[in-house]
């Protein structure tokens, strides 16, 4: 029988959560499909280091994630830094945002690859995930935080 050590509890703070998220550009966004199955895909969180509880993503209005969030707002974001043995699961509520000023504010040059018509393209929308709960694992231990 394998020996199992209980992970020690660590205090997860918003500052620690921001520090992990700002070093991980790509997270796995999980939404609920019409079939009820969980549907995950990689998404860039734009390294939003001034995190206030909301995480922003760009997507096309006709994409699966936008359609799924419109039908069921439950979203999970999975962040991973295996090199540092740090993992975060962030649960929240997603909403689709059609705000040109916000798109321009969050836009950065690398997005031109995915969205060649720029932030003015009406087919490009924002997904805002309002964080509600986070769980953190690291080599020091694990902890959670209600947001």
Predicted segment positions?
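A glycine-rich, hydrophobic loop/mini-helix early in the fold
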Residues: 33-37, 44-47
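General beta-strand recognition
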Residues: 28, 54-56, 135
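Short, basic/aromatic recognition patches
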Residues: 7-24
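A generic structural signal for short beta-strands and their flanking turns/coil linkers
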Residues: 25, 41, 51-53, 71-75, ...
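Charged, gly/pro-rich active-site loop segments
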Residues: 2-12, 90-147
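A short mixed-secondary-structure module that forms the rim of ligand-binding clefts
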Residues: 46-84
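Short, flexible loop segments at the rims of nucleotide/cofactor-binding pockets, characterized by
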Residues: 5-8, 34-35, 54-56
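A short, Trp-centered hydrophobic/proline-enriched beta-strand micro-motif
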Residues: 19-35, 75-79
